[in-house]
Structures are given as C-alpha cells and as structure tokens.
Amino acid sequence: MSITKDQIIEAVASMSVMEVVELIEAMEEKFGVSAAVAVAAGPAAEAVEEKTEFDVVLTAAGANKVAVIKAVRAATGLGLKEAKDLVEAAPANLKEAISKDEAETLKKQLEEAGASVEIK
C-alpha cells in the first residue's frame, strides 16, 4: 500500500516541532542533502549607473584669494562682487550638473589659483 502526499502532509502537520526537526535530520542523513534554504538566483545585478553630472564645490579660497576670485569669475561669468562673495562664502557650489571633463578642467584651474576644490 502506497502513502499519498496528503497523508504525509497530515502526518507532519500533527507532529511537534521537535519531531519535525528529528524528521528533517533523518531525511538529511538518508538522502545526503541539506535542508538549508537555497538562495534563488535573483535577477542579475543592475549595472551600476555611471554618474554623468557633477558639482564643483569650492571648499576653501587658500592664501591667494585674489587669484581664486579671478578664476571663479572666469569660470562662472559672475561679476567681481558676486565672485568675491562666493569665494568668501566657501564652502560653496560653483557649478552644478556639469560633465566630468568640464568639472575636472574647472577643478584644475581653481587649484592652480590656490583654491581647494571638490567634485561631487
């Protein structure tokens, strides 16, 4: 006489937790398997999106503030007073959402003038 799946399920449902643990251990031994939860292969990891827009942040004017103000004016097109206020308000965003090449060029120009600059 053959036992059906429903009968097995009913038998397991009527067992205590300790009996179920013992049953699992016996099945692991008998069939040479592990009852550890198998991790299902999820969707492939999404490609990390490369950042395309960068912000250039003036963190400090440095010792040569006049040269930094000139560099800020040249880079941003601001007037003398606005550029001076921006440099004195450091840390301050100089340009936002620009390309990586443009950000690197601006950073290099400002650092040559004596400023401390970050690209975010």
Swiss-Prot record:
The keyword Cell inner membrane belongs to this UniProt entry's keyword annotation: no
One Gene Ontology CC term in the entry: cytosolic large ribosomal subunit
Cross-referenced InterPro entries: Ribosomal_bL12 (IPR000206), Ribosomal_bL12_C (IPR013823), Ribosomal_bL12_C/ClpS-like (IPR014719), Ribosomal_bL12_oligo (IPR008932), Ribosomal_bL12_oligo_N_sf (IPR036235)
Any GO BP: translation
Matching Pfam families: Ribosomal_L12 (PF00542), Ribosomal_L12_N (PF16320)
Keywords annotated in UniProt: Ribonucleoprotein, Ribosomal protein
Keyword Ribosomal protein: yes
Molecular functions per Gene Ontology: mRNA binding; structural constituent of ribosome
Subunit structure: Homodimer. Part of the ribosomal stalk of the 50S ribosomal subunit. Forms a multimeric L10(L12)X complex, where L10 forms an elongated spine to which 2 to 4 L12 dimers bind in a sequential fashion. Binds GTP-bound translation factors.
Physiological role: Forms part of the ribosomal stalk which helps the ribosome interact with GTP-bound translation factors. Is thus essential for accurate translation.
Family to which this protein belongs: Belongs to the bacterial ribosomal protein bL12 family.
Annotated PANTHER family: 39S RIBOSOMAL PROTEIN L12, LARGE RIBOSOMAL SUBUNIT PROTEIN BL12M
HAMAP family: Ribosomal_bL12
Protein name: Large ribosomal subunit protein bL12
